[in-house]
């Protein structure tokens, strides 16, 4: 389970290396980097992607050469890419080193901040025959982000708990992705000071911290879900401030993160209006 979560949640890292020229045969080894490649104007040059790369729609038709367990090293070499977009937090380092030994150019890309999304798009646009496509996409992202900041700017904080999985209960701590999305909307993470990036917690710990909002999976919120019996113990449940979020929007740092921001901010606004 933790391997799958790590594959879905990029850590902060990026390689600002410059392209020697336009790439013609590109392989992406993570879902978020596939989306960013399309934003950067590289979609028509992708020849293979990671197993969970399902957006945009045309990515589903591409050959799959990696997943949370590893990458298909021999197949990638056989495809003769002139650029691999790798993710050091999710792709095995030894296998990436082997790709480098074969002379395959690698762009290491895992952006874990809102500004980093735009920067990543700009950097990858350097590998496109039309870099202006990615530059425009990055500018539009920043403009929309600024508009959302003006719309939802507030110092009225809302405490929340974000549940990533049920068995075990995993959450996010510190400034690890997607914490910045919640902070952007005025959220205060009840596990912000956790020692691990994505710690395992107990129901008792959640009860003790009394979150005003609980973001959980649809299954966890069902009538017979894991939180049902704690309605009188957790403010979020007692006030019906329990919501599910689009996991792709919130967990992948891409242009669609703007949708996640709107979703989270609107939920927090609902809480503030009821106070």
Curated annotation (Swiss-Prot):
Residues of the Fe/B12 periplasmic-binding domain: 25-272
GO biological process, one term: cellular response to iron ion
Signal peptide positions (record): 1-19
Site positions per UniProt: Important for BtuC binding: 74, 204
Keywords for this protein: Disulfide bond, Periplasm, Signal, Transport
Localization of this protein: Periplasm
UniProt GO cellular component terms: periplasmic space
GO MF, one annotated term: cobalamin binding
The UniProt record lists the keyword Transcription regulation: no
InterPro entries noted in UniProt: ABC_Transporter_SBP, ABC_transptr_periplasmic_BD, ABC_transptr_vit_B12-bd, Vit_B12_bind_prot
Disulfide bridge map: 185-265
Keyword Iron-sulfur among UniProt keywords: no
Role this protein plays: Part of the ABC transporter complex BtuCDF involved in vitamin B12 import. Binds vitamin B12 and delivers it to the periplasmic surface of BtuC.
Subunit (UniProt): The complex is composed of two ATP-binding proteins (BtuD), two transmembrane proteins (BtuC) and a solute-binding protein (BtuF).
Family: Belongs to the BtuF family.
Protein name as annotated: Vitamin B12-binding protein
């Amino acid at each position: 389970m933790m391997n799958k979560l790590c594959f879905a949640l990029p850590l902060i890292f990026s390689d600002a290396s410059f392209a020697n020229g336009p790439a013609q045969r590109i392989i992406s080894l993570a879902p978020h980097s596939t989306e960013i490649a399309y934003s950067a104007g590289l979609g028509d040059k992708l020849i293979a992607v990671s197993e969970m790369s399902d957006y945009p729609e045309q990515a589903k038709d591409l050959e799959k050469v990696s997943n949370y367990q590893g990458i298909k090293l021999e197949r990638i070499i056989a495809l003769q890419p002139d650029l691999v977009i790798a993710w050091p937090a999710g792709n095995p380092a030894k296998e990436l080193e082997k790709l480098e030994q074969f002379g395959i150019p690698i762009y290491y890309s895992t952006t874990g901040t809102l500004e980093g999304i735009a920067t990543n798009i700009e950097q990858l646009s350097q590998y496109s025959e039309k870099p202006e496509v990615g530059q425009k996409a990055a500018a539009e992202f920043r403009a929309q982000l600024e508009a959302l900041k003006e719309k939802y700017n507030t110092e009225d904080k809302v405490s929340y708990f974000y549940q990533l999985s049920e068995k075990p209960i995993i959450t996010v701590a510190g400034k690890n992705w997607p914490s910045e999305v919640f902070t952007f909307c005025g959220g205060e993470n009840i596990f912000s000071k956790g020692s691990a990036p994505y710690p395992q917690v107990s129901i008792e710990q959640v009860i003790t911290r009394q979150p005003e909002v609980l973001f959980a999976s649809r299954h966890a919120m069902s009538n017979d879900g894991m939180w049902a019996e704690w309605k009188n113990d957790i403010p979020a449940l007692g006030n019906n401030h329990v919501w599910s979020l689009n996991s792709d929007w919130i967990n992948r740092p891409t242009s669609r993160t703007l949708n996640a921001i709107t979703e989270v901010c609107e939920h927090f606004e609902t809480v503030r209006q009821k106070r």
